[in-house]
Each structure stands twice: as structure tokens, then as C-alpha cells.
Amino acid sequence: MAEEIFNTAVITFTLVLVGLGAGYLLLRLTPDD
């Protein structure tokens, strides 16, 4: 039970990190002028 919760937390955390990284890269790659 606890292991399942831990795995879910790790997957969620990884998805959040990937999402933030992708959003940051998109913002950096988009020309601001």
C-alpha cells in the first residue's frame, strides 16, 4: 500500500518536472520580440 503511494508520488513528481522543463524550454525558444 505504502509502496503504491510512493510510486504514484514519484511518477507525479517526474511528470511535473518534465512539464516544467518543457514549458521553460518553450518559453526560452520562443522569440520575445
UniProtKB/Swiss-Prot annotation:
Cellular component terms per the entry's GO annotation: cytochrome b6f complex; plasma membrane-derived thylakoid membrane
Biological classification of the source: Bacteria, Bacillati, Cyanobacteriota, Cyanophyceae, Acaryochloridales
Entries under NCBIfam families matching the protein: PRK11876.1-2
InterPro entries, per the entry: PetM_cyt_b6/f_cplx_su7
Role summary: Component of the cytochrome b6-f complex, which mediates electron transfer between photosystem II (PSII) and photosystem I (PSI), cyclic electron flow around PSI, and state transitions.
Quaternary context: The 4 large subunits of the cytochrome b6-f complex are cytochrome b6, subunit IV (17 kDa polypeptide, PetD), cytochrome f and the Rieske protein, while the 4 small subunits are PetG, PetL, PetM and PetN. The complex functions as a dimer.
Compartments where found: Cellular thylakoid membrane
Keywords: Electron transport, Membrane, Photosynthesis, Thylakoid, Transmembrane, Transmembrane helix, Transport
Protein name: Cytochrome b6-f complex subunit 7
One of the protein's GO biological processes: photosynthesis
Family (UniProt): Belongs to the PetM family.
Single GO molecular function: electron transfer activity
Transmembrane segments: 5-25
Membrane topology of this protein: Single-pass membrane protein
